[in-house]
Amino acid sequence: MGKKRKLDSKSPAAARSAAARAAAAAAAAAAAAAVAEPSSQPEALAEDPAPSSQPLGLSSEGAGERMMSREAGGGEEEEVEEVEVEEEVEVDEDEDGEGEGEEEEEAAERDADSIQALLNSFPKDQLVELLSAAALSHEDVLTAVHRAADADPALRKIFVHGLGWDATAETLTEAFSAYGEIEDLRVVTDRATGKCKGYGFILFSRRSGARAALREPQKKIGNRTTACQLASVGPVPPGGMATNPAPAVAPAPAQLALPPVSEYTQRKIFVSNVGADIDPQKLLQFFSKYGEIEEGPLGLDKVTGKPKGFALFVYKTLDSAKKALQEPHKQFEGVVLHCQKAIDGPKPNKGGGLGGLYGAGTSGGRKGAGGYGAHSHSLPGAAVGGHVMPSPVSSLTSLPGVAGGPGVNPALGQALTAILASQGGGLGLNNILGVGANGSGLPNPGASAGLGSSGLPGMPGAGGYLGGYGGGGGYGSTPPGGPGRNYMGH
């Protein structure tokens, strides 16, 4: 219960109390007047009304006191009611405080930072599922997804290969402008001749243009049948065409399996077409724009410190490596660098060299490691210090003097021909492989050192060009007890 209040003289309760006293006084006066009126009583009684009026006056005062008592009781009741009202108000205020706390918590759950932190804990598959459901249910979400896709050049840029040597930018414009507005295009040309190297890039303004162009990936451009794909996919997939002078990845045999990819390997990229005239520091600076580099460039010549046709970079984060691979073909000082994920290969053992595509590796015996398909554990690439060089590309013409040799798989000769036709000059493979300028297929002077041993192609036991075919050592074949080298002299 609350404390008793003293009634203010100006309050309604005080006014009611004063009115009650006035009414009691008026009643007493009326009673006195009635007694004073003439009656059958003696005149003496009329003259001296005091004895009879005194009791009346006392009773009037008693009535006034009783009324005041009732007024006081009413004041107490009013005070009790006011205390109860105050308690009810306090309870309502507590309930309002709890409601406000719930509203604040709900508002915090709708905060952008809170939602982002929550989504960061979700796996990618669950995020894709949630976003797909939201896009199907809400048109604005679907519009936002399409807008984000249109803003990404990786989804609008296509790579076309198999172009003729006379292809120009006008040739690509005429062939692809029908599919949508073209934002940019480029035909990659040879620096020496100015002729097309067989491939180019088209960047559409919208993703719909690229999708329309890729509905029919094979197109007749000029007198050539070409093929196109998204540039972000990476190297050309298997199944290149007979007239395709550009690179295409050779399909690996079904029995070959790659080892599990480590987290370190996922952060590593392989860059090809890196000539010896390229400054490694400038190359490092160029690839550092995609993220902080932990190691690289790896694969430099140990004597000269110059690139040997390729380079490896290891980024500190996986996101940086993915960013570097978003555009796998990069222009650097007038040269097109080809980037892709690196592959870790097995380390050499004491029993013999690694089984790579070119028989690369070291050997403690009389012969180098087996070549392509020589062992069931072989990997489709040449091993370079624990790294596996991505396998060379397939083309469809034979290497003169090699593909027709005894014990040589024609497909491998075709792959080597593709390298010579597309990138052999930039990588210096003509001299390394011992293919003369006249295309005879015979080694040039000094080519034997690059091959790891001397001998004629395909001759059993002589250490010819192709390890694993005809019983000879490969590029990694060595004299007894000597270390071998791969086809790039590493």
Curated annotation (Swiss-Prot):
Compositional bias ranges of the Low complexity kind: 13-36
InterPro entries xref list: Nucleotide-bd_a/b_plait_sf, RBD_domain_sf, RRM_dom
Gene Ontology cellular-component annotations: cytoplasm; nucleus
Reported effect, residue 252 to T: In P3MH; reduces RNA binding activity
Localization: Nucleus; Cytoplasm
Effect the entry attributes to changing residue 373 to E: In P2MH; growth defects, aberrant flower development leading to infertile panicles
MF-aspect GO terms: mRNA binding
Region (Disordered): 1-112
Domain RRM: 156-233, 267-343
GO aspect biological process, one term: mRNA transport
SUPFAM superfamilies according to UniProt: RNA-binding domain, RBD
Alphabetical UniProt keywords: Cytoplasm, Nucleus, Repeat, RNA-binding
Keyword Nucleus among UniProt keywords: yes
UniProt key word Zinc: no
Compositional bias ranges of the Acidic residues kind: 74-108
SMART domains the record matches: RRM
Function: RNA-binding protein that binds to a cis-localization element or zipcode, within the 5'-CDS of prolamine RNA. Binds strongly to glutelin mRNA, particularly to 3'-UTR and zipcode RNA. Recognizes and binds to glutelin zipcode RNA, which is required for proper mRNA localization to cisternal endoplasmic reticulum. Exhibits strong binding activity to a glutelin intron sequence and may participate in mRNA splicing. Required for the correct localization of glutelin and prolamine mRNA in endosperm cells during grain development.
Subunit details: Forms homodimers. Interacts with RBP-L and RBP-208. Interacts with NSF.
Matching PANTHER family: EUKARYOTIC TRANSLATION INITIATION FACTOR 3 SUBUNIT G (PTHR10352)
Protein name per Swiss-Prot or TrEMBL: RNA-binding protein P
Species: Oryza sativa subsp. japonica
Gene responsible for this protein: RBP-P
